[in-house]
Amino acid sequence: VGGKGSDRWARKHDTIFFYSKTSKFYFDGKAAGVKRDTGTKSTGGIIRTDENGRLYQDKLVKASGKYYRYYLDEPKIPEDWWTDINSIQSGSDERVDYPTQKPEALLERIIKASCPINGLVFDFFMGSGTTLAVALKNKRRFLGSDINLGAVVTATKRLTQLLQDSETGLHVFNVN
């Protein structure tokens, strides 16, 4: 999906903003790593096996003359553009029919990379509660807020179903 127009570029992406209060922030790119693309011989280098049976590629950076070894069983830190996460399909189990709902895989990558286990995730525009649900599934604490009562109801229902009989301390507050 995305905006189409004859007078501008088609808008086919979302932008994720990454903010930190200080220069000391949590980032674990390998926790959100993606499978390495081995490419072709010309782009990825020759795949070899080391003395322990692990597959790797050596890559030469021509500008510096340095070689780097990348093991294929280790995840690669993703770039800042992702094409490996698909939109939510109409028959998907995670779909809650909320108009701005994002795929859980997208939020999982962001949360794993930017919040430690037992850390706190805050979604100021929680919508359907996807961010909060993914935080819960990945052992992070969470806070959510939304001005839209429908969003609060949708997110609360989703989290309640996910939690079922757990003793969690889930509270919903109306501040209007």
Each predicted region: which residue ranges?
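Core catalytic lobe of class I
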Residues: 1-166
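Extracellular/periplasmic ectodomains of large secreted or surface enzymes and adhesion receptors
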Residues: 164-176
